[in-house]
Amino acid sequence: MFRNIESLALKKIDIELRFNNKYLSQENPLFVNDFVFELDNGKIVSKISDASVCFNINSIVAKGDNNFIENKKSTQAFRKLMSYYEVDNNIVEEIIDQVIDWIDYDSNPRAYGLEDYYYSGPLNNPKEYTGKRLFISINELKGIPAIRKIDWNIIDDHFCANQQNDNFSFNINSIELKDAYLLSSLFPNIDISDAEYIITYMPEEGVQTLTELSKLFPSRDFNSPNGMISFSSSSFLLSSKITFENYISESFSNIY
């Protein structure tokens, strides 16, 4: 049944984005209308939500000719986000370099990085090797030594591991007040109070272009972003809840 629901969700997403994949607001039927399936003595309720509003850890790298390299815009956004939690600058650089070394194909450590010699050596338990791939889950970050030096809630609250490794980006039309740090990190000249103001007064129908956003907030500086400004999404979360007599079960699926 859940497999059928996923297929229906994919079809619904395809239909909604087929003719306009550049604009997606929270008023879109994709997010408003739930799936409801009546069962004997129970039912299944499924909901699609926007999963783009997070810092994709994989955006820290960009694909070079033969290897992954640092995405300097994304790392600037990362530094700004970490500064709000007063994370020591050296630790921030360790995280950046160790994340890149874990993903890239070579065995040459960056200035603050670590390669297989560390992960397979006596100081690391369990013994393992760098992934030489993008992260699949943020839980994999628990294996990065520098990550263990900061509060895990920072990662849990703001980060994701989407398989696209494009520039740092999220759907501005889906941001909530709790996402003010992310919005501020995207724009070098937008501070927290600016970000909170923008989120508070963003129209429910959202915006479709940067020009429209700038006209709504003319005193805010949206120039030189640390990533890509997006008004739509390609990352979704399908949440399903099945109720059967006294039994309740939940299922979550990421859709890219």
Predicted features along the sequence, with ranges:
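Compositionally biased linear targeting/interaction segments
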Residues: M1-Y256
